[in-house]
């Protein structure tokens, strides 16, 4: 059975991780908060802004709807900036009705970069 992973954040880091997962045979849903960015990714099958020269295989489904991105997945990779991580995880947990983690729902992996200056987190 093929695993499905949602990668939340289609910047350079999220796109690179989506490519690595797809090359490893994982079914990937790549989500971005910007409908314009999603449309560009779908049209060009390449992240020309953040990762030019790396075509996105058809096995990567590019979506703008967060609910669709995380529906029935085995894992969720949070590749959003550190400053957006709290809001993003809260939103995902609410959409999953609190079912996030290895015993209740998809496994979460946080790969956020950066630091929040006000909290140093």
Predicted regions and their residues:
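Rossmann-like NAD(P)(H) cofactor-binding subdomain of soluble oxidoreductases
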Residues: 70-71, 75-121
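Short, well-ordered coil/turn elements that cap or connect secondary structure elements
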Residues: 23-25, 55-57, 103
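Short secondary-structure boundary/capping segments
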Residues: 52-54, 68, 100
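Short acidic low-complexity segments
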Residues: 56-73
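NAD(P)+-binding Rossmann beta1-loop-alpha1 motif at the extreme N-terminus of oxidoreductases
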Residues: 1-51, 61-64, 91
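Generic structural "secondary-structure junction" signal
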Residues: 52-53, 58, 117
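Short, solvent-exposed coil/turn elements at secondary-structure transition points
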Residues: 34, 66-68, 114
